[in-house]
A protein has these predicted regions:
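Basic amphipathic alpha-helical segments that dock to polyanions
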Residues: 58, 62-65
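C-terminal regulatory/oligomerization modules of transcriptional regulators
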Residues: 1-13, 67, 72, 89-126
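Beta-hairpin "wing" of winged helix-turn-helix
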Residues: 66-86
């Protein structure tokens, strides 16, 4: 497994830093993961899948991902307008990273406060 060398370059010039600059943002990874899971997705479907994101934030974030060539936007000239989003080949190259992050999260997930409280309620070892 290769490592980014910090000793030879400023941290801002490493592959790690570059990758983070593309995927860092409150909803970028969620959007990429949604496209990975569902393939071609329309704007309102994406909003429904993510839920808490505003229409403006979704629009801006999709434009950024499109500008970075991670997401493809296909617009169909019809009424009403139809726009679909999908991962580009470049975006698809992030799938192994997204999968690894998902696996890591499942393996190392800490119990939530709600779950912890439920466990504590039933703990009679006092």
């Amino acid at each position: 497994m290769g490592k980014c060398s910090i000793s030879q370059a400023n941290l801002g010039e490493t592959g790690f830093s570059y990758t983070l600059s593309l995927i860092n943002g409150k909803y970028k990874m969620t959007i990429l993961y949604t496209l990975m899971e569902f393939g071609v997705v329309r704007f309102n479907e994406m909003k429904k899948y993510i839920g808490e994101i505003s229409y403006k934030t979704l629009s801006v974030t999709l434009k950024e991902l499109e500008s970075d060539q991670l997401v493809h936007r296909e617009e169909y000239p019809q009424i009403p307008p139809k726009v679909e989003y999908s991962l580009t080949e470049r975006g698809k190259s992030l799938i192994p990273i997204l999968d690894m992050m998902c696996e890591w999260g499942e393996k190392h997930r800490l119990p939530s406060r709600r779950t912890q409280k439920k466990v504590d309620i039933w703990d009679n070892t006092e």
